[in-house]
Design a protein with these regions (language model features):
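N-terminal leader/targeting peptides and immediately adjacent processing regions
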Residues: 1-11, 136-137
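Long, hydrophobic, amphipathic alpha-helical segments used as structural scaffolds
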Residues: 21, 57, 61, 85, ...
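Short, charge-rich amphipathic alpha-helices with coiled-coil/heptad character
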Residues: 7-31
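Long, low-complexity intrinsically disordered regions enriched in acidic and polar residues
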Residues: 27-28, 34, 81, 90-99, ...
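Intrinsically disordered, low-complexity terminal tails/loops enriched in metal-binding residues
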Residues: 15, 78-79, 105, 117, ...
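Cysteine-cluster motifs in flexible loop/terminal segments that predominantly coordinate metals
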Residues: 121-138
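Amphipathic alpha-helical segments
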Residues: 37-89, 93
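Long amphipathic alpha-helical coiled-coil segments
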Residues: 73, 92-109, 121-125
Length: 138
């Protein structure tokens, strides 16, 4: 098969991938986040605090108390963002998509390394982040 044909077929499969329930749910969760006014306000507060923090730490006469206050505000707002129901749903959906992408990468790697892509096991309870993992071998 020619290189162009392989790329074209891969693009066709990638287009079909967008129909996978995991990607559909991720898109819905992203839209929920966009429509969640409470979450959007928290994100605005976080961005403003981050901006103010960056300005303060670059000042020649930086106010340590102000930096601490802004850092506390950043951490508190970040925690509120991550506790938001819409954000939690999004993160759960994103973790599933990340696991799917990892699986697809492993299939491609098996083929590239002369392995059998059909024998690549599907990740079990994998969040795609290997730090702290006991080692699934993927």
């Amino acid at each position: 098969m020619e290189k162009f044909d392989i790329i074209h077929e891969f693009k066709v499969l990638a287009t079909k991938l967008k129909e996978d329930d995991r990607l559909v749910y991720l898109k819905q969760a992203r839209n929920m986040n966009d429509m969640d006014q409470e979450l959007q306000e928290l994100i605005r507060r976080f961005n403003l605090a981050q901006y103010n923090y960056q300005i303060e730490i670059t000042k020649d006469d930086m106010d340590e108390a102000k930096v601490t206050e802004l850092n506390d505000e950043l951490q508190d707002t970040y925690s509120q963002i991550m506790e938001n129901d819409s954000m939690q749903e999004y993160n759960a959906c994103k973790a599933e998509v990340d696991t799917l992408v990892l699986y697809l990468q492993n299939i491609i790697a098996a083929a590239v390394n002369d392995g059998d892509p059909m024998l690549v096991p599907e990740p079990v309870d994998c969040n795609g982040v290997c730090a702290g993992c006991s080692g699934c071998g993927n």
